[in-house]
């Protein structure tokens, strides 16, 4: 099992380096690997995804380094729920209210809304730390839906 600090430590690490391979070895499944299509013409370069569907985790690499990690706390996009710990507490136990109680006021965030281009946008908050950002999204009942760790350049 990987700990929350293992995931934070892995951010920014090389795709084929020992930190990342050590992380993968602790998953009980092989990843489904994909890349963003060339048609996206992303100025930041392609993103390579390692999808651990049964574990509820997706790793995104840009320029060969771990850029972000999505934790699907609730079943979504074919992913099973991530059933491990987030910040020392079972992922499914977090709510928007107790995130604020534990972490304080977020650096950014917004209420749920419907966007004309992308559709439903869930309530979210973002905390900025020295080496990474933490973004949390919540379902309509206020329960944690998805967590993303994002490496800082």
Model-derived regions: residue spans:
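A cross-family detector of function-defining hotspots
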Residues: 2-65, 90-153
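Short basic alpha-helical hairpin corresponding to helix-turn-helix/winged-helix-like nucleic-acid-binding
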Residues: 60-86
């Amino acid at each position: 099992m990987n700990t929350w600090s293992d995931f934070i430590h892995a951010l920014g690490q090389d795709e084929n380096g020992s930190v990342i391979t050590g992380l993968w070895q602790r998953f009980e499944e092989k990843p489904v690997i994909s890349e963003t299509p060339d048609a996206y013409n992303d100025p930041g370069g392609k993103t390579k995804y390692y999808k651990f569907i049964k574990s509820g985790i997706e790793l995104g690499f840009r320029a060969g380094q771990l850029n972000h990690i999505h934790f699907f706390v609730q079943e979504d996009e074919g992913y099973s729920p991530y059933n491990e710990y987030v910040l020392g507490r079972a992922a499914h136990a977090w709510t928007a209210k107790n995130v604020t109680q534990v972490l304080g006021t977020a650096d950014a965030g917004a209420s749920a809304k419907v966007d004309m281009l992308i559709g439903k946008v869930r309530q979210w908050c973002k905390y900025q730390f020295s080496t990474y950002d933490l973004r949390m999204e919540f379902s309509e009942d206020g329960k944690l839906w998805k967590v993303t760790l994002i490496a800082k350049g």
